[in-house]
């Protein structure tokens, strides 16, 4: 996908969006073609680390005890302790709110069976099962990576929509982030980006701007 076309779409999306009293996010939307999304192997569900970050940090919760919980507190993350796991399993409404409020979960590895039993029914279908780490792990590097990470998830639909930054970032930074997303899609399918039918860029409250396709070169 042509970089200049992406830059033009980002520029237009910025110009067409009315000013708001909050920082709007940039979103990238792509529709897919000639892919049978009924087949699980054709679906995309993967994480992408954006080179310039998400524009807003991912919200992360840590499920653990001792040193792991202490690290999470020092990093300003939500902490869910061992004794809360069963309680949350019995309070589905509260668990749903927690799942909705957080982008990623990290958990002490030896607590995963307990988490699966009591929290899996809510976290699993949402693609938010925790990333297991040893009880003595230094989670700061993982947290820093996750803060810049977005998830592409098509499920069984021939399209995806993903966060690629915010309006305070430059057009070049937004396009760098979009290209990081496109690189993942290109590696997923044998014909790469051929399978992208149309692509759009938009701000939170603005209209979607279609990315112009490259004109076929004359032979």
UniProtKB/Swiss-Prot annotation:
Disulfide bridges in this chain: none
Pfam families: Ribosomal_L1
InterPro entries in alphabetical order: Ribosomal_uL1, Ribosomal_uL1-like, Ribosomal_uL1/biogenesis, Ribosomal_uL1_3-a/b-sand, Ribosomal_uL1_arc, Ribosomal_uL1_CS
GO-annotated biological processes: regulation of translation; translation
Keyword RNA-binding found: yes
Molecular-function annotations in GO: rRNA binding; structural constituent of ribosome; tRNA binding
Entry keyword Repressor: yes
Cited PANTHER family: 54S RIBOSOMAL PROTEIN L1, MITOCHONDRIAL, LARGE RIBOSOMAL SUBUNIT PROTEIN UL1M
Protein name: Large ribosomal subunit protein uL1
Organism in which the protein naturally occurs: Methanocaldococcus jannaschii (strain ATCC 43067 / DSM 2661 / JAL-1 / JCM 10045 / NBRC 100440) (Methanococcus jannaschii)
Gene that this polypeptide is encoded by: rpl1
